[in-house]
Amino acid sequence: MPCKDNQFNQRNLSQKILLLSDTHGYVDEKILTYCQQADQVWHAGDIGDPEVMRKIESVAVVRAVYGNIDGREIRNQYPLDERFFVEDVDVWITHIGGYPGRYEPRVREQLKLNPPKLFVSG
């Protein structure tokens, strides 16, 4: 769905972002090549195995959240939600967020109170 915020659409954003989700313990070598070409890699949860993130972090700057299949080690390293700014764009990443009309209750409340410009849900 296209963004309806004209200011956001008309920006000349310069960063290349690679968005991943649901790797479930596997990352293909081709993906690592794309990671090297990105300014940042965002992983929206269900990492599956800490080795996946070690591989990605060895070649890229990473922001990540844990997902519902992730164990203690991953949950200790990554948050449930990641909220940050990139090039003045307010970004919120979470794994289980839902979609318009069917957002998770905790997500729906935050979207009403403090909506980001960009919402990423794994």
Model region roles, listed by residue range:
Residues 2-62, 70-93:
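N-terminal active-site segment of His-dependent metallophosphoesterases
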Residues 1-2, 120:
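Short intrinsically disordered, low-complexity coil segments enriched in acidic
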Residues 63, 99-122:
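Conserved beta-sheet core of the metallophosphoesterase superfamily
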